[in-house]
Amino acid sequence: MTNNRVKEYDYLEAVPIEHILYAQFIKYDKLNRLFTEYYKDKPVPKWINIYIDVYQALLPIFSFYKVTNPYNITACIANLAIHYKSFFRKAGIDSFVFLLYSPTTGAATQQRFCPEYNGKYTMRMINNKEVYDMVNQNIPLIQMLCQYMNNIFFKMGTVETSVMAYDMITKFKNRQITAPSLFITSSQYAFQLPSKVKDLIMLYKKKPLPGTSDDTSYLVTQQNALDSYIAEIKKQHIEKFEVNQSWLSGFMTLSGIPKRNLKSLFNYKQSLKILKSIDEQFDQATPDSLFNVGCKLYPNKGLDSHSYDEIVNRFRCIDLDYQLYMYRTMPEAIDTVFLEQVNDPEALKNINDQYFSQNPILLEKLWYQNINKNEGRVVMTLPFIFLSSNQLSHITHGSSS
């Protein structure tokens, strides 16, 4: 059913979709402050793999309806990838960029355990038929464009983008590819990712505070993943809690994920107390330990066999490792077509001129510009590739062991 707001909305007052999408870009001065601080006592890598959560980047446009050019979505997403790739290149760090999109986030592997998972935002997308259809029409164009954008790839799936990224990251590591990873998102679910991967940084995109233009986006690492998640859902400053940061899935099972429509079984203080008690007795937080310790500490909750089943299902729905296991049983997990690329700068320029004249792809940032002083002309060359598409395909198709 189409949302009545579409009919009632005053298009003259609507915000153009491209304005919403470009607001998802974190400015270079903010990025510079964040990463200068992060690398002040660490060696700066020569390569980084960047994963961008396109689902979360597109989600805000489903509250708006003004469309000036249907191709602006593709242009903005392409420029989002170039924006971050260019930032790191200026710092002497080259990169792969993986644009990850899941229009039915959680439907394949999570709603079987928790039917309500992400229901609110799924309905928001479906009810805005105009934007929903326009996004779907842009997907083939984005896929085609990325075939010509060197080292920028677009992968579509049906699971959480965090699961897609986790799959690729672990396959890289299993093949001894040790480049650090950056995951850019505004997903609460994604806080698990840095808790699981030692050298992964999550760049959490925040909306500016009301009445300000201040960008409060921040970095999340293995050392502060759980602390940062608690601060995010409680809308408070980050505190240090003496709990294993990698047990975030256990905490989420108990306290819920607000932006994924999973309500709390325990408040955050009770959830922390349960995890601390488990930490004193066990090596890991499992559904059994969560249930048993919860019963012991909070008998007034009246937990029963139904509660146990609920905790088991919530854990399977949430836990990143379990979701990775589920994902790897699906055909989409071994798809490598998205890695196929064509070295044809002239074709890319023609595509840009044909489809994106009003909102062009920033090719000058994508390509290096080498000045040949003897001939007085600019020579456009593609960046250095540290792995071929065939090698990448072999890695991402490889086994999980």
Ranges and model annotations:
Residues 4, 8-179, 195-210, 319, ...:
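Noncatalytic, basic helical substrate-engagement surface that gates or grips nucleic-acid strands
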Residues 59, 128-341, 345, 385-388:
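Nuclease catalytic cores that cleave nucleic-acid phosphodiester bonds
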